[in-house]
Regions:
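Active-site pocket-lining/capping segments in soluble small-molecule metabolic enzymes
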Residues: 119, 123-144, 194-246, 251, ...
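Active-site beta-loop-alpha junctions enriched in small/polar residues
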Residues: 18-21, 48-52, 78-84, 109-111, ...
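N-terminal amphipathic alpha-helix/helix-capping segment at the start of soluble metabolic enzymes
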Residues: 1-16, 23, 228, 283-286
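Glycine-rich, proline-tolerant flexible connector loops at the mouths of alpha/beta enzymes
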Residues: 21, 43-63, 110-119, 170-183, ...
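Active-site mouth loops of central-metabolism enzymes
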Residues: 13-29, 75-87, 140-156, 233-247
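Glycine-rich anion/phosphate-binding loops
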Residues: 29, 81-95, 118-122
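Conserved, mostly hydrophobic/aromatic
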Residues: 17, 45, 96, 164, ...
Length: 286
């Protein structure tokens, strides 16, 4: 099934992200958690290209295939290009086709310190265009409510986003954010710029102090005062912090659905408990 067709149903699309285990762990180590997460029956599950920079291309396809064939949920395979040649991309696309994976989230990927990027693909839009020329894949792209860290300003960022859509992305999934007003302003900028494809809001339930620090460092998401106060109050009580993080994410999602967003993409961090609590809280609203 092509993921883009979900946005024609009139309901709020609700999807998850999961990731493969590190190379040092057997791939089967995540199957139990992924089965629990899949049992919540999201509209689709996306599988990241790697886990903390140490994952495997083939593991992404293997897990995406497992989710689709064995757990009965449509899957989306992430694919990055900055450190890949066309031959690398061709191998991945062939693997996806062979295993019935129809949906790809096309990403540039992170620059690796000390590693010279390959020359075949400079931007995610280059990858979108290439995938579109290579077969009948449904292509998703990423977007950044608080502006991509390498963009000079909002204008350049939206220009790059529009280019990604023009290159073949049929829908978009946003980077995480904690302030819904930031997301609504982003949607308005995208609309004015003529970005008229469905956009899913990326929600990250923060469940530990270390996760907050890591996520802010990685993506530069701003922390609204309400969020910061919650985290400060419970930062020495792990279970309370987890539950407060879940509650904050639920509040975000309820507000987003009320504002008529196209979809919610939940970054589950492979945590069935968190995914279940949030799904139970919002499923009647979708």
């Amino acid at each position: 099934m092509k993921i883009s067709s979900l946005f024609n149903s009139g309901k709020t699309v609700f999807s998850f992200e999961v990731f493969p285990p590190k190379k040092t762990s057997p791939i089967e180590s995540v199957y139990g958690r992924l089965e629990e997460i899949s049992a919540l029956k999201p509209d689709f599950i996306s599988v990241t290209y790697s886990a903390g920079g140490s994952g495997s291309k083939s593991r992404t396809c293997e897990i995406a295939t497992k989710i689709k064939r064995d757990f009965g949920v449509e899957s989306v395979a992430h694919l990055t290009c900055i450190n890949s040649t066309k031959a690398d991309i061709d191998r991945n696309l062939a693997l996806f086709k062979e295993n019935g994976i129809e949906n790809i989230l096309a990403l540039r990927g992170d620059r690796v310190e000390g590693v010279e990027p390959q020359k075949d693909f400079t931007y995610a839009s280059d990858l979108c265009r290439y995938i579109a020329s290579q077969g009948d894949f449904d292509i998703a792209g990423a977007c950044y409510p608080e502006v991509h860290s390498e963009a000079t300003d909002e204008v350049e960022d939206i220009h790059n986003l529009r280019k990604k859509v023009e290159s073949g992305a049929s829908h978009l999934i946003s980077q995480l954010f904690f302030d819904n007003s930031v997301y609504y302003r982003f949607l308005e900028r995208a609309k004015i710029a003529g970005v008229n494809v469905p956009i899913e809001a990326g929600i990250m339930p923060v469940t530990s102090k270390s996760q907050i620090e890591r996520m802010v460092s990685m993506c530069g998401a701003s922390l609204p005062a309400k969020f910061a106060k919650i985290m400060q109050k419970y930062d020495t009580r792990p279970e309370a912090l987890r539950d407060a993080g879940i509650a904050y994410a639920v509040d975000q999602i309820v507000d987003l659905i009320a504002h008529g967003v196209d979809g919610i993409h939940l970054y589950t961090m492979n945590n069935p408990y968190v995914a279940r609590k949030i799904t139970e809280a919002v499923s009647s609203l979708l």
